[in-house]
Amino acid sequence: MDLLLNCLNLNTIAIASILSLIFLCLFLYRKNSRGKDAPVVSGAWPILGHLSLLNGSQTPHKVLGALADKYGPLFTIKLGMKPALVLSNWEMSKELFTTNDLAVSSRPKLVAVEVMSYNQAFVGLAPYGPYWRELRKIVTFEFLSNRRIEQRNHIRVSEVRTSIKELFDIWSNGNKNESRYTLVDIKQWLAYLTFNMVVRMVVGKRYFGVMHVEGKDKAQRFMKNIREFMNLMGTFTVADGVPCLRWLDLGGHEKAMKANAKEVDKLLSEWLEEHRQKKLLGENVESDRDFMDVMISALNGAQIGAFDADTICKATSLELILGGTDSTAVTLTWALSLLLRNPLALGKAKEEIDMQIGKDEYIRESDISKLVYLQAIVKETLRLYPPAPFSSPREFTENCILGGYHIKKGTRLIHNLWKIHRDPSVWSDPLEFKPERFLTTHKDVDLRGHNFELLPFGSGRRVCAGMSLGLNMVHFTLANLLHSFDILNPSAEPVDMTEFFGFTNTKATPLEILVKPRQSPNYYETL
């Protein structure tokens, strides 16, 4: 009997030991497969987290770039009570967009996004799902496809040439120095040009210049609203990190957002009613139809998801105007600033245009493919000064592993493009303006989201759909300006490159330059 009990005890101990070993192996396997948590930046405040880090005098992308040097390419900060993963490395970007793209294809519902984008009706800020897929398909086909871009070629050509003619008139009537140069605010000129170009394509109106068809006061007010819109859209409110404090509206940001959104919606509603009346009166000519005309017909009063046709039409039109005007003008301003600081590169660009186009000849959009150095200038500008130093906000919708770290569902993503674009392990002399790198060591690097060391338009499912149109406008405008005018820095000091962080990364100060015609008077008179 004792022998039997001893045998049973030994069997029990053996089974228990085996089970314990199995459970230990399973625990270790799950722990290893789960991955460890990414490093967390120290110094978080109770409730507010690391918000104080992002509200200092230095721009947020530079602050987080410096933290990446300390904590590595993946680390976590707390935006109030919300965890956010900061990604600052091209290898991690590649892993993210090739392995976990679906998990990070949605957008967080921030206060600015809710209040100012018609509650996430913007296709670029909508959560990933059926509404986003359906609307992106319509917008791409009706406005951003190569066929539609080519159909609206005459608008872009007309606006650029008209603006060049107006700049020539400013020179003709302005005060000239001993070298016959005239001082102009080129940053403002670019803002008006890109605004006219995009607004004509979207709603068929021209607001600025000698050929404007709307009241100047109305135009200036709308431009002011747009600038405020972009600044407010880039504002991270305390309520975004601590939702329970939203009712306090600390800083008054939400109040300002609502006031701005109301003003902008008022004009959009006017445009929509004008287009609807034009359709009822049969005044729509197929060749003259703008994007709002097309959207009214395409939607035909139908609802998509939770949004009615009017809301979709207004939201999408506004989004195209915002995205097309601000990022284009910002990129052109940085490009000219860099060229004025680098006269050798400016000289090479003009030499290429002279050789490929010729004196007193007009540039066509089809000529841009021959201007390879000019394209390299634009790439280098987008590397050093991407219009959005952080890609648009994303949120993980499921748990995943990235770089060996466990990322929890609900974590927000801050993708620091500015830091990635200045990685010394990828780019030699990363802080220097060297367009030649895109003709030699990086000649195969494109901007379409497949080369993860250069992602000014993002990557994956949420890559910027307006990339082709935006590049088209930047290349064509820059080529025409450099072909038509000699430009100089009016100061003995280098051009100020101070940045102002908002929804886009703008130049904080005006860009005043000296201009003088490069072509004969007849060239400008027949534009």
Curated annotation (Swiss-Prot):
Keywords: Heme, Iron, Membrane, Metal-binding, Monooxygenase, Oxidoreductase
Protein's cellular compartments: Membrane
Cofactor: heme
A GO cellular-component term linked to this record: membrane
Induction remark: By fungal elicitor.
Tagged with keyword Heme: yes
InterPro entries, per database record: Cyt_P450 (IPR001128), Cyt_P450_CS (IPR017972), Cyt_P450_E_grp-I (IPR002401), Cyt_P450_sf (IPR036396), Plant_Cytochrome_P450_Monoox (IPR050651)
Binding of heme, residues: 464
GO molecular function: heme binding; iron ion binding; monooxygenase activity; oxidoreductase activity, acting on paired donors, with incorporation or reduction of molecular oxygen
Enzyme Commission number, as recorded: 1.14.-.-
Group of enzyme by EC: oxidoreductase
Main location class: membrane
Record-stated family: Belongs to the cytochrome P450 family.
UniProt protein name: Cytochrome P450 82A3
Organism: Glycine max
Gene name as annotated: CYP82A3
